[in-house]
Amino acid sequence: MPGTKAPVVFIHGLWLHATSWAPWQELFAEAGYEAVAPGWPGDADTVEATRANPDSVANHGIDDVTEHYVKIIDGLPARPILIGHSFGGLIAEKLLGMDYGVAAIGIDAAQIKGVLQVPLSQIRGSLSIFANPTNRHKAVSLTAKEFRYSFGNALSEEESNALHERWTIPSPARPLFEAASAALSPHSPAKVDTANEDRGPLLLTMGGKDHTVPEAITKSTLKQYRHSSAVTDLVEFSDRGHSLTIDSG
């Protein structure tokens, strides 16, 4: 039908449950969009149920999570607008490059293949996970202290702790290992078709206080698209951290 708005698919990243998108879904629904926020493979319907069964989310990697969303998109009436946060942003970029979306927004998106910067704050935030190589096949959780550093550093401790309690879930560590080793693998799951000339527009956002995906990573991600004439833009929120999709700011 002429004038019908594209559906919207929200894609969460590691450690946040899909229901954390609920306020966004309501906002988009009020504007006339059909908005859905499916979880990753193995995610239960609630935060509590997902926490109770961490093994169900273990060992899922970037490719099978992407394929999970491909199947969801195939069931929609039209190609959607993709909005992803962190690793959800990376997956949104992959899907856009595969022509499974009409447009995409990567909010503090995880690094794709070709991004070589590894800022110290990112190393500190993930060191405990990489210290044990067997974590690659496990589900891992963040303590309130770890969440405060990686997500809530731009917030009060009280708000950070409240968000940790409300939204966090165990998540597969495998995507972290895949992204970290992308430079060593020609066919890395973190590879995105950045040269696609026919894809829809892409907006990347970055938080100036983000410890998990510092600005240097997002700026380098933007450079990976330099060989495509498709629209790619970048917006900075200078006072925001990685929690910007769920916090009060």
Residue map of PLM features:
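Active-site glycine-rich loops that stabilize anionic/oxyanionic intermediates
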Residues: G13-H17, S86, G208-K209
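Catalytic histidine-centered segment of alpha/beta-hydrolase-like enzymes
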Residues: S238-G249
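Conserved alpha/beta-hydrolase "acid-adjacent" motif
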Residues: H211-S220
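Flexible "cap/lid" loop of the alpha/beta hydrolase fold
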Residues: Y100-H137, P175-L184
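Gly/Ala-rich beta-loop-alpha elbow adjacent to hydrolase catalytic centers
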Residues: I83-G88, A92
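Active-site loop/oxyanion-hole signature of alpha/beta-hydrolase fold enzymes
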Residues: A44-P80
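Short beta-strand/loop motif that positions the catalytic acidic residue
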Residues: D198, L204-M206, D210
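Conserved alpha/beta-hydrolase
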Residues: F28-R51
